[in-house]
Design a protein with these regions (language model features):
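Acidic, serine/threonine-rich low-complexity disordered tracts
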Residues: 79-81, 230-300
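Short helix-loop boundary/capping segments
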Residues: 179-253
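An acidic-aromatic
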Residues: 84-156
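N-terminal secretory signal peptides that target proteins for export/translocation
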Residues: 1-16
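A short, structured loop/turn motif at beta-sheet edges
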Residues: 55-57, 172-183, 259-268, 298-300
C-alpha cells in the first residue's frame, strides 16, 4: 500500500509537471517572433482590402504622379505629363497638372523611363488644376461651366482608381521583390471589366472635350454660330460612332502594381498599364498603352 501511495504521488507530480511544461512551451511558442500562429502572412486579397480601408480613413494626403501614352509602333511616350494631388477634409481632392520636364525630386526630367523630350505638350504655357468632391462613393468634378475639360482629369485620381478596382473582378497576386517593409501586389482586371471601364473613361473624356468645344462655339457671334454648332455636332457624332465601333472589337488588358507598407498597411505607390489592341479604319492592328505611376507622399 505504501509503495502504491508513492506511485500515485509520483504519478500526480509527473502529471502536474507535464501540465506546467506544456504551459511554458505554449507561452514560448506564442511569444516567439515570426511565429506563424501570431504573424500569419496575410493573403494578397487581405493586403489590398486593408490598404483600401487605410486610405479611405484618411482626412488628408498628398501624392505625385506621371502619365503617358505609349504606342507600339514607336515605343515612345506621347502626351506625357506630370501631376500632383491633395486630399483635404476626407472628400475634397485637387489635381494639378505640370508640364513635362518639370523638376522632380531627383532633379531630372526623366522618370521611370518616360522621357520628357518625347512629349508634345510643350506648346502649353502651363498646366491646370481641377477639383473633385466625393459624394456617395463617387467623385464629381467641381469645374466651372466654361472649363469642362478639366473634369477629364478624374482618370488620374489614384483614390478613385483603388475604389474602382475594388468593385471589379480581378486577380491579385503577391509580386516577387516584396521586402520586410513592403508588400507588392500585382492586380490584373478581368478582361471584360477592363474593357468596360476603359470605354467608360473614353466616353467621359469625349463628352468633356465636346462640352469644351461647344462652349467655345456658343461664344461666337453672328450668323455663322448656328452653322458651326451644327457642324461640330456632326463631327462628334461621327467620332463617337468610330470610337464605339473600335472599342467593340478592341481587347483591353489592365494591370496594376500596388506597393503597401507592411507596418501601416497604407499604399505607398500605385502604377498601372492599360493596353488597348484595336483595328483602325484601314483594318490595321494597333496597340496603345496608357501608363501611370503615382507615389503617395504624406498621410494625415
Amino acid at each position: 500500500m505504501e509503495n502504491l501511495g508513492r506511485k500515485d504521488g509520483f504519478y500526480m507530480i509527473t502529471r502536474q509537471g507535464m501540465r506546467t511544461l506544456m504551459l511554458l512551451l505554449s507561452v514560448i511558442i506564442l511569444s516567439a517572433p515570426g511565429c506563424g500562429l501570431i504573424h500569419r502572412e496575410r493573403t494578397p486579397e487581405e493586403v489590398f482590402s486593408m490598404a483600401l480601408s487605410g486610405i479611405a480613413g484618411k482626412e488628408k494626403l498628398d501624392f505625385v504622379g506621371e502619365a503617358g501614352l505609349r504606342r507600339e509602333s514607336s515605343g515612345l511616350f506621347e502626351n506625357q505629363f506630370k501631376f500632383e494631388g491633395k486630399l483635404e477634409n476626407h472628400d475634397q481632392l485637387t489635381l494639378q497638372t505640370r508640364l513635362p520636364g518639370a523638376v522632380t525630386a531627383a532633379g531630372s526630367s526623366k522618370v521611370n523611363g518616360m522621357d520628357a523630350a518625347s512629349a508634345n505638350l510643350t506648346t502649353q504655357p502651363s498646366g491646370f488644376s481641377a477639383s473633385f468632391q466625393r459624394k456617395k462613393g463617387q467623385w464629381e468634378a467641381l469645374t466651372a461651366e466654361q472649363e469642362p475639360l478639366r473634369g477629364s482629369l478624374s482618370r488620374y485620381n489614384p483614390i478613385a482608381q483603388l475604389e474602382n478596382i475594388d468593385r471589379m473582378n480581378k486577380t491579385i497576386k503577391s509580386e516577387y521583390g516584396s521586402g520586410r517593409r513592403t508588400r507588392i501586389l500585382r492586380i490584373e482586371l478581368a478582361p471584360e471589366d477592363a474593357k468596360a471601364w476603359a470605354t467608360t473613361q473614353l466616353n467621359d473624356e469625349m463628352n468633356a472635350i465636346k462640352a469644351e468645344y461647344m462652349h467655345r462655339a456658343s461664344n461666337i457671334k453672328g450668323k455663322n454660330k448656328a452653322k458651326l454648332e451644327k457642324e461640330l455636332s456632326q463631327v462628334w457624332q461621327q467620332g463617337e460612332a468610330s470610337m464605339e465601333q473600335m472599342m467593340k472589337q478592341a481587347k483591353v488588358q489592365t494591370v496594376y502594381h500596388l506597393t503597401v507598407d507592411r507596418k501601416t498597411s497604407l499604399p505607398l505607390r500605385l502604377s498601372s498599364e492599360s493596353q488597348v489592341t484595336y483595328q483602325d479604319a484601314s483594318n490595321k492592328s494597333n496597340k496603345e498603352a496608357l501608363v501611370m505611376d503615382v507615389n503617395f507622399k504624406t498621410y494625415d
